[in-house]
């Protein structure tokens, strides 16, 4: 998206085409010092420019912890989230094994000072990474791992 950035794993058009209203993705989220939770993302509706998602958080046993919130995102903005600088990022072809399944994918690893952010994108699932980690000074401070996907 920028001349000093790597190509993104998916184009805005691929993200739009991969957005299926009614799809529900659940991800286990862990933050340093907090209990793990499940983040739920539901694809609600789409048009040529963007899509509407609904989000909420659940406990590991499925109890809703907050009211759902809807958000509209523009396809190009979603693509831009994966735009990473060449001088700080490596890209590797990998096999991704998560509770949701095993996928061929791309692993983007961005290093900025003591912070290492790693994003695993399943090439068959245009959109958000199915796994993410953030480490600061070697300590894991955040992770998100897709655990289930339900399509209509």
What do the PLM-derived regions correspond to, one by one?
Residues 1-152:
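Acidic, serine/threonine-rich low-complexity disordered tracts
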């Amino acid at each position: 998206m920028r001349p000093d950035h790597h190509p993104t794993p998916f184009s805005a058009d691929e993200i739009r085409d991969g957005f299926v209203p009614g799809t529900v993705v659940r991800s286990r989220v862990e933050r340093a010092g907090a209990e793990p939770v499940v983040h739920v993302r539901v694809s609600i509706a789409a048009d040529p420019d963007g899509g509407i998602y609904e989000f909420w958080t659940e406990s590991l046993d499925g109890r809703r912890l907050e009211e759902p919130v809807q958000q509209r995102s523009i396809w190009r903005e979603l693509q831009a989230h994966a735009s990473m600088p060449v001088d700080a990022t490596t890209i590797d072809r990998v096999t991704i094994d998560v509770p949701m399944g095993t996928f061929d994918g791309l692993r983007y690893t961005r290093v900025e000072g003591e912070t290492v952010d790693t994003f695993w994108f399943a090439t068959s699932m245009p959109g958000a990474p199915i796994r993410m980690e953030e480490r600061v000074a070697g300590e894991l401070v955040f992770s998100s791992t897709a655990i289930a996907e339900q399509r209509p």
